[in-house]
């Protein structure tokens, strides 16, 4: 593997992650902070590592990420999507494996807007019969 850098953009909800991957020892840096420091929740850290663990490249690549917008869950999902795209740039043969795990597809779910006359997006005001 050469010292080439691979890039992938990931999105989830309102978060956008720019992911750079290059040959290394498995360090993951998010917004100039180590992964364990940036994400307090173990589930978020697990989500970020999923594509690397699937293709067994956890200790072969260094990942550098800048992520903006959204909350922790959205950002973790965006980073996962970005890492997946960077891995596909590195080796297109990984696509079927990553596709079967559901990492290639962009999760299109977003918050539904609140409608006029309703309490929330779908919650209607309480109905009183009498």
Swiss-Prot record:
- Renumbered to this chain, the signal peptide range is none
Q: Which GO terms describe its cellular component?
A: cytosolic small ribosomal subunit
**Single GO term (MF):** RNA binding
Instruction: Name any Gene Ontology BP term.
Output: translation
User: Pfam families given for it?
Assistant: Ribosomal_S9 (PF00380)
Keywords of this entry: Ribonucleoprotein, Ribosomal protein
The name this protein carries in UniProt is Small ribosomal subunit protein uS9
Question: What organism is listed for this UniProt entry?
Answer: Shewanella frigidimarina (strain NCIMB 400)
The gene name on file is rpsI
């Amino acid at each position: 593997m050469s010292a080439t850098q691979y890039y992938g953009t990931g999105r989830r909800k309102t978060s956008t992650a720019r992911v750079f991957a290059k040959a290394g020892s498995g360090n993951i840096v998010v917004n100039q902070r180590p992964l364990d420091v940036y994400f307090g929740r173990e589930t978020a850290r697990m989500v970020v590592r999923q594509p690397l663990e699937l293709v067994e490249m956890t200790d072969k690549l260094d990942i550098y990420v800048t992520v903006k917008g959204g909350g922790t869950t959205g950002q973790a999902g965006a980073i996962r999507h970005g890492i997946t795209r960077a891995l596909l740039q590195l080796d297109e043969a990984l696509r079927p494996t990553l596709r079967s795990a559901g990492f290639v597809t962009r999760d299109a779910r977003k918050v539904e807007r609140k409608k006029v006359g309703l309490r929330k997006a779908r919650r209607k005001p309480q109905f009183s019969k009498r």
